[in-house]
From Swiss-Prot:
Compartments in which it is found: Secreted; Secreted, Cell wall
PROSITE patterns per the UniProt record, alphabetical: POLYGALACTURONASE
Tissue: Pollen.
GO biological process: carbohydrate metabolic process; cell wall organization
SUPFAM superfamilies reported for this sequence: Pectin lyase-like
Active site: 210, 233
Function: May function in depolymerizing pectin during pollen development, germination, and tube growth.
The EC number(s) this enzyme carries: 3.2.1.15
Species assigned in the record: Brassica napus
Protein's name in the database: Polygalacturonase
Taxonomic placement: Eukaryota, Viridiplantae, Streptophyta, Embryophyta, Tracheophyta
Length: 397
């Protein structure tokens, strides 16, 4: 039986933060039915409403094909996902997206429901973690040019590619998000962000097969707080420098987070032989708990996946004003701290304050390595901090 669309008006002051009288556009159907058309119709009606409105997917299990919801809308809009939506297995094949919200100012996504990407079959055929020349898979949920938004109390399960991708947004908050995929699921970044300003990621649990959070170029004023990450590849700034059109990264704060069993911890990564010259400045990691984390603190300015770069040409990305404060816990390998900076642009003003990282493996005590950086030391450091030599690039005075 086909899906249906119900439209009715109710008082939703407690549910909506926008208005005491809001029109609610419901998109539902029989169990396991395809509600794609109903969702698009509901969103179109809500987007044209003269007052704040709500799109509601009720409790239940539904199928959802490629769904692109585009503004601008006449008034703020709330998208409430109470049910569980799964990919339909057809309309997203060969596409790079599943659910898209774009060009919306004044937006809420909530409801306690789940976006189920059903990625298990796709992961087996995915080789994007081995080569850049691979077939792209759909990102589960994209936010493109979305401003003044709150995304809260939703789950992303088993994404085929990234769980959430956030591009060119302003004043967005992610709160109490759950992201779930197996550790072996390739390219399933939890939240990837680029060219946004004023984003907060709070009280969120991420277990996935790639970076829990990855910060791309052009990010400004990002706060990541009270996030639990693991399994996964840690919290990363970068990679930066692969493309010539990239922009500076400024004011990134990661605080009061816990990393558990991740293959990397707190990481900044830039490409050698970079295609641009940009700056990443004001990056602060503080009050972090580590539990069996490999490579807990890592600056890698020789990041070169798929061997698609020339490591003989140093990275042209400048890293300035970087701090690691009150980082404590256990490492799964002896490389507790590794600061591998560019010989073309040595890291500037890197501060290491009060770190205590323990390792008890058979290959010796934990190490603290520095290349092309002389960090400022504050408080105590375990392992004992290096005072790294600065190696000048050829032709530099």
């Amino acid at each position: 039986m086909g899906s249906y669309l119900g439209i009715y008006t109710i008082l939703v002051l407690c549910l909506l933060g926008y208005s005491a009288n809001a029109e609610v556009f419901t998109a539902g159907g029989p169990p396991n039915s395809d509600i794609t058309a109903a969702v698009l119709k509901a969103f179109t009606s809500a987007c044209q409403a003269p007052a704040p409105s709500q799109v509601l997917i009720p409790k239940g299990d539904f199928k959802l094909g490629e769904t692109v919801m585009t503004g601008p809308c006449k008034s703020p809009i709330e998208f409430t996902l109470q049910g569980n939506v799964k990919t339909d297995g057809g309309s997203t094949q060969g596409k790079d997206r599943w659910v898209v919200f774009e060009k919306i100012n004044g937006f809420k996504l909530n409801g306690g429901g789940t976006f189920d990407g059903e990625g298990n079959a796709a992961w087996k055929a995915n080789n994007c973690h081995k080569t850049f020349e691979c077939k792209k898979l759909p990102i589960s949920v994209r936010f493109d040019f979305v401003d003044n938004a709150e995304i809260k109390d939703v789950t992303s399960l088993d994404a085929k590619n990234f769980h959430f991708n956030v591009i060119s947004g302003k004043n967005m908050t992610f709160d109490n998000i759950k992201i779930i995929a197996p550790a072996e699921s390739p390219n399933t970044d939890g939240i990837h962000l680029g060219r946004c300003e004023g984003v907060k990621i709070l009280n969120t649990k991420i277990a996935t097969g790639d970076d829990c959070i990855s910060v791309g170029d052009g990010m400004k004023n990002l706060l990541i707080e009270k996030v639990v990450c693991g399994p996964g590849h840690g919290i990363s700034v970068g990679s930066l420098g692969r493309y010539g059109w990239e922009q500076d990264v400024t004011d990134i704060t990661v605080k009061n987070c816990t990393l558990e069993g991740t293959s990397n911890g707190l990481r900044i990564k830039t490409w050698p032989s970079a295609a641009c010259t940009t700056t990443a400045a004001g990056i602060h990691f503080e009050d972090i708990i580590l539990n069996k984390v490999s490579n807990p603190i890592l600056i890698d300015q020789e990041y070169c996946p798929w061997n698609q770069c020339n490591k003989n040409k140093p990275s042209t990305i400048k890293l300035v004003d970087i701090t690691f404060r009150n980082i404590r816990g256990t490492s799964e390998n002896k490389d507790a701290v590794k600061l591998l900076c560019s010989k073309g642009h040595p890291c500037e003003n890197v501060e290491i304050g009060d770190i205590n990282i323990e390792y008890t493996g058979p290959d010796g005590p934990p190490t603290f390595e520095c290349t092309n950086v002389t960090p400022k030391l504050v408080g105590a450091q375990n392992p004992k901090a290096c005072v790294g030599p600065v190696v000048k690039a050829p032709g530099k005075e």
